[in-house]
């Protein structure tokens, strides 16, 4: 069985039970992508860093209504707490498992 959680806040980890499910399965690495970079992606990365996860933001799988904000976050803010990767990087890593 897959774990299915409902998201009620911008942050995908807060109040969803996802953190508990991940820890129960000894999962410490999170690959984060989505819309909007300035919303769910940023909020989830910040909270995930506080929870000591290893974070990977998939740059080419994130977007924002403001391209300048997206670029600023990807290049200046998110790298402080996450590794910025491409979808190609993720595919290669998964194939190597």
Predicted regions and their residues:
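Active-site-adjacent betaalpha module
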Residues: 1-97
């Amino acid at each position: 069985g897959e774990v299915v959680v409902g998201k009620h806040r911008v942050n995908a980890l807060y109040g969803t039970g996802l953190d508990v499910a991940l820890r129960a399965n000894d999962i410490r690495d999170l690959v984060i992508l989505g819309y909007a970079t300035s919303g769910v992606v940023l909020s989830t990365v910040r909270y995930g860093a506080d929870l000591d996860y290893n974070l990977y933001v998939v740059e080419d799988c994130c977007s924002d209504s403001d391209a300048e904000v997206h670029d600023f976050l990807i290049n200046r803010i998110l790298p402080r707490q996450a590794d910025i990767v491409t979808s190609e990087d993720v595919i290669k890593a998964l194939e190597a498992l």
